[in-house]
C-alpha cells in the first residue's frame, strides 16, 4: 500500500466516523492555488455551490456524481475539470478525491451560473 493510499484510507475512516460524513485535508495553499484531499462517506452530499475560476477532481477511490446543469459520474482513477456552473458533489460510494482549485484569475470571478 502506498503512502497516498494509506493517507486516503485514514481520511476516509475519519469521514465515516464524522457526523456529517466528510473529512478534508488542505495540502497546498499557495497564492490562488489550493489542493485539498476530500473524503465522503457513501450518501454524503456537498450542497450546491459556486465553482471557482478553475477546478478539477482526481478520484483516488470510490465514485461521485457532480451535478449542475449536467451530471457527471466520476470513478476511481479519473480526472475531470469541473464545469463553470454551480454544482453539488454526491458520494455514490465511500470516496476520496483530490480537489484542485485556482481561486482567482485576473479578470475572472467565481462562476455562479449566471450569464
Where on the chain are the PLM-derived regions?
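A short, N-terminal "cap"/entry segment at the start of jelly-roll beta-barrel domains
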Residues: 1-32, 67, 113-115
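Conserved short histidine dyad/triad with adjacent acidic residue
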Residues: 20-21, 31-51, 84
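Glycine- and acidic-residue-biased ligand/ion/polar-headgroup-sensing regions
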Residues: 42, 52-69
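Residue-level marker of beta-strand positions
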Residues: 45, 78-79, 96
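Short beta-strand His + acidic residue motifs that chelate non-heme Fe in jelly-roll/DSBH
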Residues: 46-48, 66-67, 86-92
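A cytosolic small-molecule/anion-sensing beta-strand core signal
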Residues: 60-61, 75-76, 93
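Short acidic-glycine-tyrosine-enriched beta hairpin
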Residues: 69-85
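Ligand-binding loop in jelly-roll beta-barrel domains
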Residues: 84-107
Amino acid at each position: 500500500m502506498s503512502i497516498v493510499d494509506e493517507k486516503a484510507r485514514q481520511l476516509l475512516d475519519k469521514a465515516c466516523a464524522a457526523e456529517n460524513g466528510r473529512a478534508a485535508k488542505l495540502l497546498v495553499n499557495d497564492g490562488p492555488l489550493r489542493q485539498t484531499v476530500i473524503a465522503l462517506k457513501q450518501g454524503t452530499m456537498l450542497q450546491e455551490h459556486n465553482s471557482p475560476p478553475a477546478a478539477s477532481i482526481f478520484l483516488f477511490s470510490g465514485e461521485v456524481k457532480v451535478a449542475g446543469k449536467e451530471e457527471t459520474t466520476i470513478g476511481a482513477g479519473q480526472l475531470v475539470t469541473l464545469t463553470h456552473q454551480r454544482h453539488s458533489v454526491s458520494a455514490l460510494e465511500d470516496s476520496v478525491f483530490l480537489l484542485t482549485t485556482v481561486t482567482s484569475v485576473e479578470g475572472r470571478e467565481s462562476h455562479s451560473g449566471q450569464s
